[in-house]
Amino acid sequence: MRQRGRATLLVALLLLVQLRPESSQWSPAAAAANVVQDPNLRWNPGVRNQGGGVRALLLLLAERFPRRAGSEPAGERQRRDDPPLSIDLTFHLLRTLLELARTQSQRERAEQNRIIFDSVGK
């Protein structure tokens, strides 16, 4: 739980560093838009190292958690329709781990087959 709080704090600090008061992201009109309008600024998980990981993270967070014009108390928050980010990350990590496990098992099978063919060929 403590690491999760640190990660959240780090992300918040990165967002604050990227946003400037003269930027349009601080205006109520931009907050009311509620989406990132420029398609070039959309986060694409297939494209890596295009402008750095921090920029991609900030763009993803800007899409998922747009700024609201008024601050609402915690009990009156609007319910989000899209799934939480942690589920997306969990499934991404699961797919990656399954792919790594599949690759490793293929290597082990290839090594076992090589040993068998070497012993039969002698």
From Swiss-Prot:
Secretion signal, residue range per the UniProt entry: 1-25
Main location class: secreted
A GO cellular component entry from the record: perikaryon
Gene Ontology MF annotations: corticotropin-releasing hormone receptor 1 binding; corticotropin-releasing hormone receptor 2 binding; G protein-coupled receptor binding; histone deacetylase inhibitor activity; hormone activity
UniProt keyword terms in alphabetical order: Amidation, Cleavage on pair of basic residues, Hearing, Hormone, Secreted, Signal
Pfam families, sorted: CRF
PROSITE patterns: CRF
Residues that make up the propeptide removed upon maturation: 26-80
Gene3D superfamilies: 6.10.250.1920
GO BP term (any one): positive regulation of cardiac muscle contraction
Location of Valine amide modifications: 120
Entry superkingdom: Eukaryota
Subcellular location: Secreted
Oligomer and partners: Interacts with CRHR1 and CRHR2 (via their N-terminal extracellular domain).
Functional summary from the UniProt entry: Acts in vitro to stimulate the secretion of adrenocorticotropic hormone (ACTH). Binds with high affinity to CRF receptor types 1, 2-alpha, and 2-beta. Plays a role in the establishment of normal hearing thresholds. Reduces food intake and regulates ghrelin levels in gastric body and plasma.
Similarity section: Belongs to the sauvagine/corticotropin-releasing factor/urotensin I family.
Name of this protein: Urocortin
Protein source organism: Rattus norvegicus
